[in-house]
Amino acid sequence: MAGTLFIILRFVDTTLPSSRVYCVRSLEVSVAVELAAATVLAFESIGVVDDCGRSVLFSIILIAAFICSVFLIASEDIAGSRRSTGSCVTLWEGRNISFCLYRSNWLNTVPVGYMFFLRKNRSLDERYF
């Protein structure tokens, strides 16, 4: 699972342009997990997959749902458009972007638990958050 996550992060790092700030809300991640689990259970209940194929199908659907949430659901340019204070912990640093867990103190606009794909050369200070 860790290897799969690393491959996804490397793909996103080399694909996304570094001139924008992209985010994935924790809500979309949880929806992706629930969608994958529900799909696997549906296929299993009608006899399409067995115990062996269940984990493979779940992994494929989860990865696809996560990639879709990154590129389609939650990508937005937030640089300069939102102001708040908070802290960002870098989880993984790539060539163009960093994968950070951001905890905001400004709960009215930016919920706690946002995960950001941030430009690597962007300073993480109150000018942007």
Swiss-Prot record:
Domain of life: Eukaryota
Topology in membrane: Multi-pass membrane protein
Spans within the Extracellular topological domain: 50-54
Keyword Glycoprotein: no
Residue ranges crossing the lipid bilayer per the database entry: 29-49, 55-75
Stretches in topological domain Cytoplasmic: 1-28, 76-129
Localization per Swiss-Prot or TrEMBL: Membrane
A Gene Ontology term for the protein's cellular component: membrane
Main location: membrane
Keywords: Membrane, Transmembrane, Transmembrane helix
Note: Partially overlaps CMP2.
Protein name, as recorded: Putative uncharacterized membrane protein YML057C-A
Provenance organism: Saccharomyces cerevisiae (strain ATCC 204508 / S288c)
